[in-house]
Amino acid sequence: MGFGMIFYGLILMKNAFESVRGSEEFEKIFLIANADTFKGRFLCVMIGMIVTAIIQSSSAALGVTISLAIVGLIDFPTSVALILGQNIGTTITAVLATLNASTNAKRAALVHSLFNIFGVVYMFFLFNPYIKLVNFLAGFIVSIFNSLYILI
């Protein structure tokens, strides 16, 4: 039942974004925030981080990103850059929770944030090889399934 509700929610978000698909103002945002350039990639990471920090739910932000990708408003590299930003933005919840906490709790939140930031910086510089690898593997897996389908 839980998985069904998740997919139902994704369908609802997809349908909501289909109505905005033709909006020029909405599409301009994603033309500016396109992960094809270094600047655009950085902007996508910042957008993902800010949106996730505001709504304080990386799952909801990821659902929105998936819905935008399904509708075709953003491409795969842009969605990956947004998800990298969401990875940093999700740490704001831990930071906010430790505002009136002990020193050790603040240290744990700081380490959590730094770990995610370093992971995103690491992936930021490996971004293009990662995208190429995923595209290659996706095509490779599809060709394997096509071959198996022909054999069966």
Regions found by a protein language model. Give the residues of each.
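Membrane-interfacial helix-loop connectors
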Residues: T52-G89, T98-N104, L110, F127-N128, ...
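Membrane-embedded alpha-helical segments of transport systems
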Residues: I6, L10, I55, L84-T93, ...
